[in-house]
Amino acid sequence: MSIQKVHAREILDSRGNPTIEVEITTGKGMFRSCVPSGASTGVHEAVELRDGDKKRYGGKGVLKAVENVNTIIGPALLGKNVLNQAELDEMMIKLDGTNNKGKLGANAILGCSMSICRAAAAEKGLPLYKYLAELTGHKEMTMPVPCFNVINGGAHAGNALAMQEFMICPTGATNFHEALRMAAETYQCLKVVIKAKYGQDATNVGDEGGFAPNVSGAREALDLLVEAIAKAGYTGKIEIAMDCAASEFYNEETKKYDLGKKIPADKKDPSLVKDVDGLIAEYVDYGKHYPIASIEDPFAEDDWAAWNKFTVEHGNFQIVGDDLLVTNPARVQMAMDKNACNSVLIKVNQIGTLTETFKTIKMAQEKGWGVMASHRSGETEDTFIADLVVGLNCKQIKTGAPCRSERLCKYNQLMRIEEELGNIPYAGKNWRNSTA
């Protein structure tokens, strides 16, 4: 059960950018984890260490992070017991010594943290999801509702859409296998609808496997989704979730939100620039006309007053904090104190250790918040989050469209888990009630 070897290397993610992979060897074998990275990153996230050498990968290399594992973290882990997850995570945090993992890199630390956990699961002879449940004291497990990002905008696409993700969520399915089939069929129908309206080029896919047709705005994107859902025969069984990533179209100086940020100034309708009340009215109007269940990052990451107003007045929506919370227990506590949202997005690389991730999830579950596990736009073949979402009973996951292998590997792993567990319940309409 003690660590015999730690080795890191630089690999490429799904966007062709470097990322880090860490291997930990024990008497049970070798355990490997790959770390993802995001495109729209919150300013409060832990530091993803990049080399900054413009002559190599445009400055995005991770050789420093690799070296930190191989020369600093690795030697400190040798001989340690992999069953002591919290102790080893704490040791790595202290080894770094900063409050944002800026010295060694959250990417370096997380790769080690995940591989330690995998090694421990093997030590116990358990599948990863069962070990994660045992490690965190979760007695119940539920198959999550998958949220598929099928229309892309914002930082993920070259169209005029300011908001970043439009997702389909099969809450009316009876099990995970059926949910995946419903989404895949709807995705294929969406492709047909988009091709007919915008031409073949509009069916090219973005970083997360979704389409990026040249729509004029959110309503046009939502109309496409409703049409595709109806065409697939799933009206009333598939709901819609949005990730607005509003920090990306917020103007710090004017304190306004520009829904036409990506439209040339001479062609832009001035009414697309909204104050907080105007943007809230926009969201409420979407909710009246479309089956919208969940809205992520509806406001900028430090516009606390707007978050509070929306949550107090319109908490019937699931209001998800991503850039606002960055999977950080301290930020989650602030949001609870300010009543700023009612759900948390979990991205393990935003915080950099599993122990801190577990703490964030526990806080949210004890408060009765929704918990949604998430991929990043720069992904790998690593399936850790699929086991995490089941083991910690999160009930929701978003990991892209049913397209591109780095997305599908997570969904396929969830199908394997459901098959293995047999009669495990599916979250369905109960997806917002995460339980500790």
UniProtKB/Swiss-Prot annotation:
Disulfide bonds join 147-169. SUPFAM superfamilies: Enolase C-terminal domain-like (SSF51604), Enolase N-terminal domain-like (SSF54826). Its cofactor is Mg(2+). GO terms for biological process: glycolytic process. Mg(2+) 1 binds at residue 40. Mg(2+) 2 binds at residues 243, 296, 322. Belongs to the enolase family. Homodimer. Homotetramer. Interacts with methyltransferase METH; the interaction inhibits METH catalytic activity; 2-phosphoglycerate binding to ENO prevents the interaction with METH. This is Enolase 1. It comes from Entamoeba histolytica (strain ATCC 30459 / HM-1:IMSS / ABRM). The lineage of its organism: Eukaryota, Amoebozoa, Evosea, Archamoebae, Mastigamoebida. The gene is ENO.
